[in-house]
From Swiss-Prot:
A motif (PDZ-binding) lies at residues 874-876. Residues 27-412 are extracellular. Coiled coil: none annotated. The lineage of its organism: Eukaryota, Metazoa, Chordata, Craniata, Vertebrata. The gene is Epha5. Changing residue 817 to A: Strongly reduced binding affinity for SAMD5 SAM domain. Changing residue 857 to A: Strongly reduced binding affinity for SAMD5 SAM domain. This is Ephrin type-A receptor 5.
Amino acid sequence: MRGSGPRGAGHRRTQGRGGGDDTPRVPASLAGCYSAPLKGPLWTCLLLCAALRTLLASPSNEVNLLDSRTVMGDLGWIAFPKNGWEEIGEVDENYAPIHTYQVCKVMEQNQNNWLLTSWISNEGASRIFIELKFTLRDCNSLPGGLGTCKETFNMYYFESDDENGRSIKENQYIKIDTIAADESFTELDLGDRVMKLNTEVRDVGPLSKKGFYLAFQDVGACIALVSVRVYYKKCPSVVRHLAIFPDTITGADSSQLLEVSGSCVNHSVTDDPPKMHCSAEGEWLVPIGKCMCKAGYEEKNGTCQAPSPVTNVKKGKIAKNSISLSWQEPDRPNGIILEYEIKYFEKDQETSYTIIKSKETSITAEGLKPASVYVFQIRARTAAGYGVFSRRFEFETTPVSVAASNDQSQIPIIAVSVTVGVILLAVMIGFLLSGSCCDCGCGRASSLCAVAHPSLIWRCGYSKAKQDPEEEKMHFHNGHIKLPGVRTYIDPHTYEDPNQAVHEFAKEIEASCITIERVIGAGEFGEVCSGRLKLPGKRELPVAIKTLKVGYTEKQRRDFLGEASIMGQFDHPNIIHLEGVVTKSKPVMIVTEYMENGSLDTFLKKNDGQFTVIQLVGMLRGIAAGMKYLSDMGYVHRDLAARNILINSNLVCKVSDFGLSRVLEDDPEAAYTTRGGKIPIRWTAPEAIAFRKFTSSSDVWSYGIVMWEVVSYGERPYWEMTNQDVIKAVEEGYRLPSPMDCPAALYQLMLDCWQKDRNSRPKFDEIVNMLDKLIRNPSSLKTLVNASSRVSTLLAEHGSLGSGAYRSVGEWLEAIKMGRYTEIFMENGYSSMDAVAQVTLEDLRRLGVTLVGHQKKIMSSLQEMKVQMVNGMVPV
């Protein structure tokens, strides 16, 4: 906070408008005004133009408490002394008043002119902003006024719960700031009919009372106050991940993040309430968690929608004992309709109803009573579940005819004949099906079960073919028991037939639903493309498509689809989502969600220094949440690195790359060999290198390296050290140094992840909790690791990168492609490598090295030189 009182005010200068193509010019019709004296018509014309050009809508995250441009009546402001500030009353083309105030006592000494606003309610906001638009005369353009003319004015505020507390003494007001103009106008500007309008914004907080007054003090300037806008900022209500986050007023501190819990949209649920964080600038940051649509509903445009009800039902043939109906598919099926459920009952007997299921849009209900009214309702079922029933439709069966009533004597004969026929038919069916009864679920029952209870045949077949998809089941997978509600990772390699694993965990997609647009990379087995996926009844989605190259072997196909078998078991917002596979046509494809920003390491390198610490922590939190999910399922990733994290346009990070098989060989580089090449050991825990012991704890070590990559914006871990040197240094206790400008809390978490004893490393759920605490308390991230402690944890020698490897400062700078700074270094006394080795980050800024990327490159090289100069540092 800035300011001279007990409460301060930050300030931000937004714009000043002056000459050039964008400069507003006074219309020719008003040119006559400018030949008038300074006071009166001249200012009136000038200010009228200014006001008309600045009636702009406020951004959606700003809520106005006062806008003098929109007040229709009297502002109620008070000026004293009365011959100081003067209100100029004009109207625009719609006859709405334009409120402007001017003062120009530049020829008189000791000016002290005050303009007081009426009481302004803060509406619960603890930090408010004041936007001023004004014009100011250049003192040099006023003959005879140089000794007394000023080019600034002062702004004050006073907090009060009293709406009528105008009796405030001058010394009770707290100064917000002295306001100066970016541009002032001269006599020449008046001749050219050019208006120069300044815009200044200041903020005040924290506020503790219900409202406040503003005051403007003139001390001898020639100024016109065109408009005053007072507002606070909020994070506007938004729906994110099927959760509604309400309007949230920002906090009092400019660095404060407010944690806000969201509520799930209708027909969606979650285990833990989703959260987002409202920044001081009115932006939603760091989304955590999401809601999921309930069974029977599907996500569409931020809502959970069920299949729309059947609305158009037509009656077909109606008889005394049956009614035939037909209907049209719902307007919004929200997916492929699998079947319809028809519920009907005799009117006024709703408790006794019958259900018919049909895959067609027509049915015939039989066995009804003559001359009776029946009520029908229909609903559709998709893969997401059932929709809502339609409204009730009533139809009446026909009465019994007279001829039929005279033939009642024939009914017993017909009934006996039908009964005998049914029994004979049941006996025949029983003998025919007795050998296959066990296959359909009757167990050891003999053929007699079919004879004695013909209905069992139907039930047996129904339970096999018509099993309710929502019924809870217990599955056995190659010796693994999968209980309802317990998600456990199942290794696809335990399946005798790998294709079974693919079909178990991945959805088959028709190739015709996929449109490939462009190639975005090359994978281990073929090209990686971006494209679109359009499934029937669903909206089109952008997707990434991995293809299997032509001429593949069966083993390559099995390995390629193995990743889909793994990925298909995961369902988490921070794990890459598998849309499905194409295996019944060529090319064989794996289809996943599309992540616009690609791999995290490349993205960070392209955007070096562009994110706040909170945004970086939000990325790390997402990765940790994804890894916690994998750890809870019993899955060990083994290859966690920034290159295997994908990031979308909302900066949400998702763990990917589940398809690599790893075999540790006797390699001089101590690398893991895979089908696609070698994975460097820089991300791998020491026990995994030495004993092939991969656990969630070894993933935690890798996560610490990912943290280092993120905070250093994609820098290569251990720089150009060889793998052998890295293994040796880590075994001896050396650890990576803190990245530049790294919060101490984050670096300490990295060191915790790099504990040699894997049992001493934090669990992923603990890491998520630690990062949540940092996000809720941003001030804890302000303490940075100092330069000396950064060097103390540096790794052992980096070969020939020390100061002795370069003969001059110029040669060193050229070697790291920073030769442009050679002359600056020499001019400031850094003429030897020994002198250069003592340079700090502050020195670089003082020398004019302002680009963050250049600072990092030079400091990294200097740190490496220091390592060689001390010839081995103290282990962690």
